[in-house]
């Protein structure tokens, strides 16, 4: 199981939110570049990077900063937040970003996902499914659709998506443990596509449980920044 430390960017700083609430923001490192270097120096190979400003603006707000992170750190990076156009994806891939996460647009315009898969390939496109009580949330988690997370995942898999990031918004940033039942259901319902878990990880035991379920990777944020899980422990899972 791959471990992906998370860096969420808001106003140029690394932050953590509580249940996706922008009003409950904690700055964990004011220097994004320094945080990326910390991961790199610890032997981490791949990170999960979210442009929180972009989720609200609907554009690549922190594109220049993200480009600098890639250039200086040399880390493998997947980027999400505000991805609305193929041109944005082209731009990110051109500067070396490894994977692009499509979130809201998977619900609002499935043809956009199809076009992205056709142009860039399934190894470069990840669909991020964020859900509240099992229903898909969009627009930086500010809106909730009537689409069930399993239904969306199965539709996207038929389209050719091979990797999903599933976030239980109600667990994100809470340190209450991941929603294991949701991950069990999602892994069992998908035919060949893989799942990366996100939201709620609090301790090392949570990573062991997720590995047993069969997720391909897990994103770790607050548990690391709070000191619950060390970088050495993350590395032991193949981070």
Curated annotation (Swiss-Prot):
A single GO BP: L-histidine biosynthetic process
> Which residues are named in the active-site annotation?
8, 130
Catalysed reaction equations from the record? 1-(5-phospho-beta-D-ribosyl)-5-[(5-phospho-beta-D-ribosylamino)methylideneamino]imidazole-4-carboxamide = 5-[(5-phospho-1-deoxy-D-ribulos-1-ylimino)methylamino]-1-(5-phospho-beta-D-ribosyl)imidazole-4-carboxamide
Q: Which InterPro entries match?
A: Aldolase_TIM, His_biosynth, HisA_bact_arch, Isoase_HisA-like, Isoase_HisA-like_bact, RibuloseP-bd_barrel
Q: What class of enzyme is it?
A: isomerase
Q: Keyword RNA-binding, does the record have it?
A: no
**Which pathway is this protein engaged in?**
Amino-acid biosynthesis; L-histidine biosynthesis; L-histidine from 5-phospho-alpha-D-ribose 1-diphosphate: step 4/9
Pfam families hit by this protein: His_biosynth
* GO CC field: cytoplasm
Q: Name one GO molecular function term.
A: 1-(5-phosphoribosyl)-5-[(5-phosphoribosylamino)methylideneamino]imidazole-4-carboxamide isomerase activity
Q: State whether keyword Oxidoreductase applies.
A: no
Name of protein = 1-(5-phosphoribosyl)-5-[(5-phosphoribosylamino)methylideneamino] imidazole-4-carboxamide isomerase
Instruction: State the species of origin.
Output: Streptococcus thermophilus (strain ATCC BAA-491 / LMD-9)
Its gene is: hisA
